[in-house]
Structures are given as C-alpha cells and as structure tokens.
Amino acid sequence: MATENKNLSEYDKNTIPNAKDFRFGIVVSEWNDVITEGLYNGAFEALIDCDVPAQQIIRWNVPGSFELIYGAKKMLQTQNVDAVIVIGCVIQGETKHFDFVCEGVTQGIKDLNVQTDIPVIFCVLTDNNMQQSIDRSGGVHGNKGTEAAIAAIKMAYIRQQASISHPFNQPLLSSGALQIEETPIKIEKE
C-alpha cells in the first residue's frame, strides 16, 4: 500500500492563504466520538496554526453522521461562516446500514456544495474497521481533520477571490464567452 505507515497530513504553511480573517464552522458527529474528537482536534489545531482566532471557529455537535447534513445546512444559514467542515466516522458492520449512511451523507454534502455558495468540506471517515479510523484520526496516517482544515482555508480563499473578481465584471470575448482572469492560487499537489 502506497500510504502504509505514512503521515499524509503534513502541510507547508507558506502554501496556505492567510486565514486570520476567515470564520469557520465545524459540525461534529457524536457517533464514534473517540475518532471524531481526534478529527476535530486535528482540524481545530490546524486552523489555529494557520492564524485563525479561536473565537472565529464555531463547533456544533450532532448525534450521528447522517445528521451532519442538517447541521451543516443550519450552520450555513445562521452563522456567517466562510466554510464548514463536517466530521464523522462510519465503520463497516455486518449490514447494509454502512452503505446507506455513507451514500446519504456523501450525496447530502455534495448537494450543499452545489446549492450554496459556501464550501462544505467532507471529513467523514468510511473505514472497514476501527484501526483504520484510528490510523487516520491522529495515528500513523496523520489526521484527516488536519487535511480538512487546510482544504477549508483554501476553499474559503477561492470563494473570497471569486467574489472579488466576479466573472460578470470581466469583458466578453468575441465569441460571447466570458473572459475570466485567473488568480494564481498556490495549492499543494498530492
């Protein structure tokens, strides 16, 4: 396996946009809380490390991963955030419940990203066993919460830049298409 015993959550602060003025929401599932607390801690610590003041990070808890969708929707509607991170953990069991929850949560978060103008970052572990989740929530593979926080900063920055250089302010090409000037954004390649 290419990721075996490799921490995938390291980041270079110099490649991340300034985040001190952004406001983030984090919606955390209480189910499998040993894992979701580790993911939350990774996300929170990464946001703080990237100069987001603690008072600009809002945390809401929901009972399970399926409820992340509603929690994120309400946070988007009421909290004036620049991005939301949803944190959950679904571990394979003996029934199809795992498939239904994973599919529903994935589609629900995708729908929020399509329907709203605020990025929602998916940090829901869908592992085969508890050890895989431990390894990805602060264990040998790093912390997916950390990775989600960095993604949230980058997406909040993209949203900010897109509103500054709105495409309707750009000239039309002779073909009638909008000419959009690209704003360089440093994003690490994985």
From Swiss-Prot:
Keywords: Riboflavin biosynthesis, Transferase. It is an enzyme of class 2 (transferase). 5-amino-6-(D-ribitylamino)uracil binds at residues 31, 65-67, 89-91, 122. It comes from the Bacteria. Transmembrane segments: none annotated. InterPro entries: LS, LS/RS, LS/RS_sf. Pathway: Cofactor biosynthesis; riboflavin biosynthesis; riboflavin from 2-hydroxy-3-oxobutyl phosphate and 5-amino-6-(D-ribitylamino)uracil: step 1/2. Its EC number is 2.5.1.78. One of its GO terms (molecular function) is 6,7-dimethyl-8-ribityllumazine synthase activity. The active site is at residue 97. One of its GO terms (biological process) is riboflavin biosynthetic process. Belongs to the DMRL synthase family. Catalyzes the formation of 6,7-dimethyl-8-ribityllumazine by condensation of 5-amino-6-(D-ribitylamino)uracil with 3,4-dihydroxy-2-butanone 4-phosphate. This is the penultimate step in the biosynthesis of riboflavin. This is 6,7-dimethyl-8-ribityllumazine synthase. It comes from Flavobacterium johnsoniae (strain ATCC 17061 / DSM 2064 / JCM 8514 / BCRC 14874 / CCUG 350202 / NBRC 14942 / NCIMB 11054 / UW101) (Cytophaga johnsonae). The lineage of its organism: Bacteria, Pseudomonadati, Bacteroidota, Flavobacteriia, Flavobacteriales.
